[in-house]
């Protein structure tokens, strides 16, 4: 089973003027200057910090991950002063495992930069490149055997179908971490099971 705990409240935001204020997520520092349709809004690096207690988990059987669903545009994530990961791209989910770094109380720091750079596309657009953490941040607790979380932030499941009159061929590819088999079920609109498949890990 997977448990999810949101980290949306009790953040400290240090903006371009160096002043630190309390904020909740989602948050952007361009909420005002990015509204007039011009290209004169402020772009640069700001910092978000929060503290959280370690979740209840079994380190022998489970892992803990941080999940960011949207940080625009580049991010550097630190946990307890140690760099955890970096990410370029403001519109995609990214995750990092933190099991071995957790303390009883933890400080999470996210350095966010929406400056113009050559790593994040699009380079130009007719909309504002809002800087900030504008989607959910979560703690995930999963079993060590789980659908992969670290594959470019995707779901770890790819479904393709070949529809024919009166039938459908459905192929499900699942990226997994750990050992064991994967069971896939197909339900109809009423929640009744109409198909089931099982496969072993191949690599």
Identify the role of each PLM range.
Residues 172-173, 185:
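Beta-strand-rich structural segments
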Residues 2-40:
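N-terminal structural segment of carbohydrate-active enzymes
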Residues 62-64, 166-172:
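Structural beta-strand segments of beta-rich domains
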Residues 193-203:
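Intrinsically disordered, low-complexity Pro/Gly/Ser/Thr-rich segments with frequent PxxP/GP/PP motifs
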Residues 158-168:
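Short, solvent-exposed loop/linker segments at the N-terminal edge
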Residues 23, 86-87, 196-197:
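Short capping micro-motif at the N-terminus of alpha-helices
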Residues 20-23, 147, 157-159:
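Short clusters of hydrophobic/aromatic residues that line enzyme substrate/ligand-binding pockets
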Residues 3-6, 11-16, 43-150, 154, ...:
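Accessory beta-strand-rich segments of carbohydrate-active enzymes
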């Amino acid at each position: 089973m997977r448990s999810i705990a949101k980290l949306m409240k009790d953040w400290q935001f240090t903006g371009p003027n160096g002043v630190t204020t309390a904020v909740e997520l989602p948050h952007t520092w361009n909420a005002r200057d990015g509204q007039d349709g011009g290209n004169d809004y402020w772009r640069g690096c700001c910092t978000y910090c929060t503290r959280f207690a370690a979740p209840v988990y079994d380190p022998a059987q489970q892992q803990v991950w941080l999940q960011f669903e949207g940080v625009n545009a580049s991010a550097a994530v630190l946990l307890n002063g140690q760099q955890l990961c970096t990410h370029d791209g403001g519109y995609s989910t990214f995750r990092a495992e933190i099991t071995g770094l957790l303390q009883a109380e933890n400080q999470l720091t996210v350095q966010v930069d929406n400056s113009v750079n050559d790593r994040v596309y699009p380079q130009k657009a007719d909309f504002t490149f809002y800087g900030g953490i504008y989607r959910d941040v979560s703690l995930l607790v999963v079993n060590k055997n789980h659908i992969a979380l670290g594959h470019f932030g995707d779901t770890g499941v790819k479904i393709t179908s070949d529809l024919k009159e009166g039938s459908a061929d459905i192929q499900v590819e699942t990226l997994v971490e750990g050992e064991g088999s994967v069971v896939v079920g197909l339900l109809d609109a009423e929640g009744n099971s109409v198909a089931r498949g099982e496969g072993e890990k191949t690599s």
